[in-house]
Amino acid sequence: MSAAPGGKFKLSGLETTADDHDAVEQATAYIDDIIQRIRDISNNLMPGTLVRKGVLYAIEEYIDGLSKNEALKISFVHQGVPELDKAKAINIYRLVMEIIHNTLKHAKAGFLDIEFKREQDMLILTTQDNGSGFDYETMKLNNSGLGLRSMLNRAEVMEGDMYVESSPGKGTKYIIEIPIT
């Protein structure tokens, strides 16, 4: 076995059957798929666009990529948002990703409107979907919903507040207020 370019290994000199060859091909395809998934996850956690061009462009790029593959119509408008420090930009990006992910996975919504604006010394991120909604108070009492807890923690880390308006059958609205400091 010797390393080939790209980090793959050649099984030269070994006697193999057709079944062995098929198994190696399947394993190679599986490993290639895992590598691609890791790259995708890594890119979603910290996309190069976020570092190079900022949070607004990174969100727009993510939404553009989704619109080609998902039935969900996403609208993103922003107004007066200043350049943000890296930590705040990452947290806001991940908040938006979690909201989009939850909308796709749970809400069965047709649209998701995202608005991000500056009001005096606050950044206001507001999202609204027309999905199935959920009982927010019950989820809070039961301490369920890992994504929701993650979102609350991110808002708290930025010394912000997150408000949720949702009920079964009525869609979900998130309002996240973050001080500009």
Identify what each model region corresponds to.
Residues 129:
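Acidic ATP/Mg2+-coordinating residue in the GHKL
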Residues 25-32, 36, 49-70:
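Short beta-to-alpha transition helix within the HATPase_c
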Residues 66, 72-79, 84, 124, ...:
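Conserved transmitter core of two-component histidine kinases
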Residues 1-20, 101-118:
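Short alpha-helical "switch" segments that flank and position catalytic residues
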Residues 94-102, 106, 150:
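Conserved polar catalytic motif of the HATPase_c/GHKL fold
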Residues 117, 165-171, 177-179:
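A short beta-strand-to-loop micro-motif at the C-terminal edge of the catalytic HATPase_c
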Residues 138-170:
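ATP phosphate-binding glycine-rich loop and adjacent ATP-lid/helix-beta elements
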Residues 1, 73-97:
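Conserved short strand/loop->alpha-helix "switch" segment adjacent to the catalytic nucleotide/phosphoryl-transfer site
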